[in-house]
Amino acid sequence: MRSVKYILLVLLLLPAMQQVHADDIGLWAEAGFSKSISKKFSWGMEAGMRTGDDFGLISRIDIGASVSYKPVKFLKLTAGYALIFDHERMEINEHFNSRGKMNGYNINKSFWRPKNRLYFDVSGKLPIGRFSFTLRERYQYTRYPSVSYDREKYRGLVSDGYTGKQYGGYALDEETLEHKKLKQKHYLRSKLTAEYDIHHCPLTPFVSAEISNDFSDGFAVVKQRYTAGVDWKIKKKHVITLGYVYTNGHDDDVDGNIHAISVGYNFKF
């Protein structure tokens, strides 16, 4: 049990050690269930949410479903769909005139943007003693519909007696409705996971590393994600997952360095 306590201690300390270097730290929570249709087929559903800075405002909500097929014991094929709503934060940009002198601000108001995601997985699992290693290759397609949002333009320094709307000492000049065009993204996400089965213990520690390649950008690596955590089998069909996630890169889900605590629950029928 000492090794288990050490693993849990490390998981609790990791976010604190990394927080100084993070652009963002939040909570990723999800819950789902899965049900076997036969020995080879199963299906499931899940829902999740993510927060932004310091466990603050919700930045993402998602719900999805998937179907899996195991032609042989060590191989699994999965197809799934997810509906995701991303919260785009308010964006404040300085505005400069043709001579390079600042003359106001452009403020894009916050808004929610939906996206539809399809994915197809091929996963292979290799047990070695009490360790098991899983390699998952995922093709992921994401479609963003067009969306509109509000923009406020502030120009001209505020004079004494001004009672209108202002920001940073500049008066509101114009409010416009802006548009983001439809876009589509194609990625290959490769993930390697290692687990360790502790004898007569309900806790299974794991670590994973994942990279994302962008098909539309010469197959460039655009994101890396590293996870350390533990699965706690509280009952035969109930599993709680606690972990720490570090993500670095720029794709359709993240932008910059993100540190998060992940919490999950899964029920198997």
Where do the model's predicted regions map?
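Outer-membrane beta-barrel transmembrane domain signature
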Residues: 137-239, 245-247, 269
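Residues on the lipid-exposed face of transmembrane beta-strands in outer-membrane beta-barrel proteins
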Residues: 31-35, 65-69, 120-124, 139, ...
